[in-house]
Amino acid sequence: MYDITEWKHVFKLDPNKDITDDQLEQLCESGTDAVLIGGSDHVTEDDVLRLMSKVRRFLVPCVLEVSTIDAIVPGFDLYFIPTVLNSRDTDWIAGLHKKAMKEYGELMSPEEIVVEGYCILNQDCKAAALTNADTELDIEDIKAYARVAEHLFRLPVFYLEYSGMLGDSETVKETKAVLQETTLFYGGGIKDAETAVKMAEHADVIVVGNAIYENFEEALKTVQAVKG
């Protein structure tokens, strides 16, 4: 089994975006703790399967972040299931999850499932629009959601998602301070070693996504920046 509490760095690949085989090899052998496959836009079963089969050639843990029921495929090491705690639509908190379990529950091992308590904080990102997230939150609201994740729902992961923009490091610091058992993931705006170190100072795990497609060489540098 994989222990996510030991992770520090994750690359997130969008199956709807292009990456060369050479880039994928460099990424998978970079020393990152896992490769997460997922996205919020036009994710298809075929694209997920194609990308998974390529990542599977390497030893790095391969994880599917489930964003649509139609793109759940077998063969991943872990399945990350987001529940968007600050969504105004209950489908994104538990409704879609019930549908997924109804269809695939008997096929999925509980040991392979990791539930992420998402808090989406960039009002302009696709994920916020898709999930109808309430992004007008102050730090006390965010800490309250973190406590909901850990103390009420006993979730293994609380995920601060800024998706496309760099968040406030003080917010990450204060959020981390209220978590004892739940692992804090941070994603959004990490584009180079400097921004990686800034967010990794307080988050347990940083997720690097868009930078892979915008400046690949700088994205690669984020691994050693946080793992040494």
Curated annotation (Swiss-Prot):
Binding site for Mg(2+): D14, S40
Names of required cofactors: Mg(2+)
Binding positions (sn-glycerol 1-phosphate): K12, Y159, L160, E161, Y162, S163, G164, G189, G209, N210
EC number: 2.5.1.n9
Catalytic reaction(s) noted: sn-glycerol 1-phosphate + all-trans-heptaprenyl diphosphate = 3-heptaprenyl-sn-glycero-1-phosphate + diphosphate
Pfam family membership, one: PcrB
GO terms for MF: heptaprenylglyceryl phosphate synthase activity; magnesium ion binding
Metabolic or biological pathway, per its Swiss-Prot or TrEMBL entry: Membrane lipid metabolism; glycerophospholipid metabolism
UniProt-listed GO biological process terms: glycerophospholipid biosynthetic process
Entry keyword set: Lipid biosynthesis, Lipid metabolism, Magnesium, Metal-binding, Phospholipid biosynthesis, Phospholipid metabolism, Transferase
InterPro entries in the cross-refs: GGGP/HepGP_synthase_I, GGGP/HepGP_synthase_sf, GGGP_HepGP_synthase
Superkingdom assignment: Bacteria
PANTHER family noted in UniProt: HEPTAPRENYLGLYCERYL PHOSPHATE SYNTHASE, PTHR40029
Family indicated by similarity: Belongs to the GGGP/HepGP synthase family. Group I subfamily.
Annotated function: Prenyltransferase that catalyzes in vivo the transfer of the heptaprenyl moiety of heptaprenyl pyrophosphate (HepPP; 35 carbon atoms) to the C3 hydroxyl of sn-glycerol-1-phosphate (G1P), producing heptaprenylglyceryl phosphate (HepGP). This reaction is an ether-bond-formation step in the biosynthesis of archaea-type G1P-based membrane lipids found in Bacillales.
Summary of subunit composition and partner proteins: Homodimer.
The protein's name: Heptaprenylglyceryl phosphate synthase
